[in-house]
């Protein structure tokens, strides 16, 4: 199962500059002149047993003005953490380029408004997008203020994903937070105004029922955005609702249920949550809750029967968040804010008192969506599926954009071996050995000019599972190993060795990812031709291009016949299948 761990990281202007009008509002974005909590999170991943995942860090600045500086700060922190995992950063600029590709495939030009890094729900969608581009089977969502304390957390997180439990397939799995006291309860102090707004009390009840009791895995009405594991069938179909301002994680559970996906929680999958203390006043925090619950209730109330969807009720999400999605929500808001206003008045805080009373008015006016939230979400879901289709169609081009920010690429060391240039005559000699067809001298020369020399040192990775097959190569010297698995995940399974004269990647025209890994066992030299250059040749010189293409097909058939690859089973298919499909 291909795993992509995604950790969005939020950045703000320097502390001395402060928040400015138009900046996005997040709980605790890291000022540019501070380090924040990201390095702590990355360093906590070092003891993980298996690092056979790709790690992506979407960089979310509160304003485009600081995007470049934020990128440099994140890269500095990643370098310092020195986590031995394949790591990417994903920037606002990367998103813009990916959006342009989506835009080109979307003739109605409707999908790109979903592709933005402003707001929590939108950021979560970008996390899913990154996982999709990297061909993930499992998207593992983590936050940058968490600490891993279990070395087997990653393999635990996907243990049940895609499997059937109690009649349902597990498409969404939730872990849970523990606080600095190693408890799963919210670290808050009860106050009188909470009598009518007992959110933490109902959360505690839900946590006790789902987290605190057996069995290990059970259906859940809630999930945590920083400990959420999604199967590709779910994240390619169901987006986070861009209109939810807060609580996008639990809202995602509601949306998923509407589309027939059930979330489960694993009560052994804990992760320590150590957020920076919130500085917002209490009236503002309850206002954020008002907006989310009023919106979610409106979405539930506005449901209507439609094909392939499930009508959900507040009771489906009891005790939390269901208790705050009922008809008495308005009464809860009124009573709790009246008491909060009284508390502020006793403290002599007239502003806090006025804002608390204003919450009541907001709940009846501004918080009410001015549109049908159910129909709007259905529209966004359809647009999200179009984005997923665009990714499937243009994954190669999008992946190239992400690879530009792959921080784990082995730097190419330039020396005499690396810089050796082959003369056209040498390349033609190798091509004549590899391919059995008659060409004129001019055609051989034309073909040779499309090939480039590539070299790899001993133990250097040539490609990894999930990388795209974008070229065909002929080995001139050295030896390559094709294998499944990894050193971190309990061992490599050697499948075959390639030596001088062997051809690698002859199925590159199928435009699909590898499911195997390839590493150089000694210094290896190859000549290769890109799939784009093959296509250009077919278009510019059809006679030569078709001849060459036929030779590629011959090589595929020869590999099928002569190498007995059928006997090597791989994930329900065979290694032969992967060669045919362009994945090896």
Residue ranges with predicted function:
Residues 52, 288-417:
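Terminal low-complexity segments of carbohydrate-biosynthetic enzymes
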Residues 70-134:
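Active-site-proximal specificity loops/subdomain of glycosyltransferases
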Residues 21-53, 76-80:
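Short, acidic, metal-binding catalytic loop of nucleotide-sugar glycosyltransferases
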Residues 443, 493-550:
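Cyclic-nucleotide recognition modules
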Residues 209-229:
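A recurrent flexible, glycine/aromatic-enriched loop bordering the glycosyltransferase active site
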Residues 414-458, 508:
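Cyclic nucleotide-binding regulatory module and flanking cytosolic helices
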Residues 245-252:
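Acidic donor-binding loop at a coil-to-helix junction in glycosyltransferase catalytic cores
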Residues 168-192:
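Short beta-strand-to-loop element that shapes/binds the nucleotide-sugar donor at the catalytic cleft/hinge
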């Amino acid at each position: 199962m291909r795993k992509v761990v995604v950790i969005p990281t939020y950045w703000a202007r320097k502390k001395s500059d402060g928040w400015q009008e138009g900046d996005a509002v997040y709980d605790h974005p890291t000022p540019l002149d501070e380090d924040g909590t990201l390095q702590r999170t990355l360093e906590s991943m070092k003891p993980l047993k298996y690092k056979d995942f790709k790690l992506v860090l979407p960089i979310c600045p509160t304003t485009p003005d600081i995007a470049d500086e934020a990128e440099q700060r994140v890269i500095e922190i990643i370098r310092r953490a020195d986590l031995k995992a394949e790591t990417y950063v994903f920037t606002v600029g990367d998103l813009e380029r990916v959006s342009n590709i989506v835009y080109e495939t979307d003739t109605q030009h409707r999908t790109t408004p979903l592709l933005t890094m402003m707001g929590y729900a939108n950021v979560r969608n970008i996390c899913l997008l990154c996982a999709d581009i990297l061909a993930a089977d499992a998207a593992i969502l983590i936050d940058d203020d968490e600490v891993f304390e279990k070395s087997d957390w990653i393999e635990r997180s996907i243990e049940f994903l895609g499997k059937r439990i109690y009649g349902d397939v597990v498409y969404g799995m939730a872990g849970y937070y523990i606080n600095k006291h190693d408890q799963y309860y919210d670290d808050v102090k009860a106050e009188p105004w909470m009598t009518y707004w007992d959110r933490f009390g109902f959360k505690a009840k839900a946590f006790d029922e789902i987290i605190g009791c057996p069995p290990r895995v059970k259906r859940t009405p809630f999930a945590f955005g920083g400990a959420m594991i999604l199967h590709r069938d779910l994240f390619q179909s169901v987006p986070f609702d861009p209109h939810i301002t807060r609580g996008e994680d639990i809202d995602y559970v509601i949306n998923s249920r509407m589309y027939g996906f059930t979330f489960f929680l694993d009560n052994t999958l804990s992760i320590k949550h150590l957020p920076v203390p919130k500085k917002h006043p209490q009236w503002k925090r309850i206002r954020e809750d008002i907006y989310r619950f009023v919106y979610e209730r409106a979405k539930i109330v506005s449901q209507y029967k439609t094909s392939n969807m499930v009508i959900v009720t507040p009771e489906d999400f009891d005790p939390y968040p269901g208790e705050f999605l009922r008809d008495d929500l308005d009464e809860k808001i009124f009573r709790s804010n009246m008491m909060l206003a009284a508390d502020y008045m006793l403290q002599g805080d007239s502003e806090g008192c006025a804002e608390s009373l204003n919450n009541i008015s907001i709940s009846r006016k501004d918080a009410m969506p001015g549109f049908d939230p159910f129909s709007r979400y259905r529209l966004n879901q359809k647009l999200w599926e179009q984005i997923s289709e665009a990714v499937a169609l243009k994954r190669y081009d999008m992946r190239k954009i992400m690879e530009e920010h792959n921080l784990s690429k082995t730097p190419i060391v330039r020396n005499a071996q690396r810089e050796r240039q082959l003369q056209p005559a040498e390349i033609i000699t190798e091509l004549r050995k590899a391919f059995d067809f008659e060409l004129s001298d001019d055609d051989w020369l034309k073909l040779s000019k499309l090939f480039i020399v590539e070299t790899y040192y001993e133990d250097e990775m040539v490609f990894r599972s999930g990388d795209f097959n974008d070229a065909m190569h002929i080995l001139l010297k050295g030896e390559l190993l094709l294998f499944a698995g990894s050193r971190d995940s309990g061992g490599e399974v050697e499948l075959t060795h390639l030596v001088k004269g062997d051809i690698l990647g002859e199925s590159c025209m199928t435009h699909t990812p590898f499911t195997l890994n390839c590493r150089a066992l000694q210094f290896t030299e190859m000549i290769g031709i890109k799939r784009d250059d093959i296509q250009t040749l077919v278009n510019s010189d059809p006679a030569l291009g078709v001849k060459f293409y036929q030779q590629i097909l011959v090589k595929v058939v020869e590999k099928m016949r002569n190498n007995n690859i059928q006997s090597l089973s791989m994930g329900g298919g065979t290694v032969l299948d992967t060669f045919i499909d362009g994945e090896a």
